[in-house]
Amino acid sequence: RLELMLVCAHPAIAPAIRTPLMLQTVLGVDADAIAHAFAVAPAAMAQRLVRAKRRIRVARIPFATPERADLAGRLPAVLEAVYGAYAIDWPGHGSPVDSLSGEALHLALVLTELLPDEPEVLGLAALVCLSESRRRARRLDDGTFVPLDEQDTRLWDRPLIDRGEALLQRAHGYGRAGRYQLEAAIQSAHCDRARNGRTDWHALRALHRGLVEIAPSLGAVVALAAVDGEIDGPQVGLAALEAIGDPSADAFQPYWATRAHLHARAGQPKAAAGAYSRAIDLTSDGGLRDYLTACRTQLPARRGP
């Protein structure tokens, strides 16, 4: 599969479509799910994928593993595809065996064997290990979503946490910080709660700020706003969300879920209810929808902003 993914990252293929192409043709992800992950209309994504496949045929791109010297230009798209596959399957609450997230974990670890001296490869593997370690705690028996700060840490997979921490330490040893290392460090900071029973929000803010600086994205900015709200109060977090100028935020579920949480903490039940409703409308996962609906139901019945 890695060989096919490297083919999809050929220089003749437009950079923006390389990762979606890998997700569909190599990892079997549905085009609609890919479109949702990239905040693109399904029809537009389908057209781009068709054009990319046509490009492979017309350009007669060989199905061969590139030389190591050529890997650097293709590696970022491969890493993004592996992480994208994991993120798309993240809501799953069954066994990781034979799942897309299980395949993503396998590919991430295989990459560390092929490229053991690439810090971002190590960082990606650490990120997937640390995220996957909490799988059992993310859902109740009925499938209802459990937010990170409410999870029972006794259900976390300690050996997988230890493996992720070891990979992250190896990555840090190269002294070249990158997106996946920072994202793994964020997950590591959350996993510290299993050891000391608390969340170091100030450490998380420093890491999130670093991530926004080197790999800005809508998700990264929303996550930083959430952390700001935890430290400085909900109004500060809401102001950070208001400052986001990306129009795609209107269709970004985490934006509305975060906004709802901050409005609720600020004592603004009316605004919170509206934001929860928008987040629910944008949620296809039943367990997460049930959780958000319960949060909306528990809001105090009073007037407010």
Language-model-derived ranges and their functions:
Residues 1-16, 22-31, 40-209:
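Amphipathic helix-loop-helix modules that constitute alpha-helical solenoid scaffolds
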Residues 36-38:
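Alpha-helical residues within the helix-turn-helix
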Residues 98, 132, 195-198, 214, ...:
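Structural motif corresponding to the intra-repeat A-B loop/turn of tetratricopeptide repeats
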Residues 129, 188-192, 228-229, 263, ...:
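Residue at a conserved register position within TPR or TPR-like alpha-solenoid repeats
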